[in-house]
Amino acid sequence: MPRLMGVDIPNDKQIQYSLTYLYGLGLYRAREVCEKLGIDPTSPASDISDEDVGRIAALLERDYLVEGPLRRQVTQNISRMREIKSYRGIRHRVSLPVRGQRTKTNARTRKGPRKTVAGKKGVKDLR
């Protein structure tokens, strides 16, 4: 099982799908990496040599933001938005959806479990 950027890459899958286990690398970029290095994207990950693994790692380090550095950049961007108190930063701060979704109903994942409010007493008496 090859290891790239601290992530175990599955042996039994094609290299193009194995590379998508890295954070920040989707199928398009995985194929792009294989094409740049002249590796057949449909070959199993178990068939690539240690030299190829080294070449892939070097290319990813040099040309792409993946794994730790990408996670760090995303976190820094969010904290910067919170710091300058932009609309998106405020939404992040109060744990509400950031991209314009409705919140009257739904948004439960972001808002957390429902906070139940007791009903009014005496409503039945009015009928």
Swiss-Prot record:
GO terms for cellular component: cytosol; small ribosomal subunit. Part of the 30S ribosomal subunit. Forms a loose heterodimer with protein S19. Forms two bridges to the 50S subunit in the 70S ribosome. Residues 97-127 are annotated as: Disordered. One of its GO terms (molecular function) is structural constituent of ribosome. GO terms for biological process: translation. Residues 101-118 have a biased composition (Basic residues). This is Small ribosomal subunit protein uS13. The lineage of its organism: Bacteria, Pseudomonadati, Planctomycetota, Planctomycetia, Pirellulales. Belongs to the universal ribosomal protein uS13 family. The keyword Ribosomal protein applies. Pfam families: Ribosomal_S13. PROSITE patterns: RIBOSOMAL_S13_1, RIBOSOMAL_S13_2. Keywords: Ribonucleoprotein, Ribosomal protein, RNA-binding, rRNA-binding, tRNA-binding. Located at the top of the head of the 30S subunit, it contacts several helices of the 16S rRNA. In the 70S ribosome it contacts the 23S rRNA (bridge B1a) and protein L5 of the 50S subunit (bridge B1b), connecting the 2 subunits; these bridges are implicated in subunit movement. Contacts the tRNAs in the A and P-sites. InterPro entries: Rbsml_uS13_C, Ribosomal_uS13, Ribosomal_uS13-like_H2TH, Ribosomal_uS13_bac-type, Ribosomal_uS13_CS.
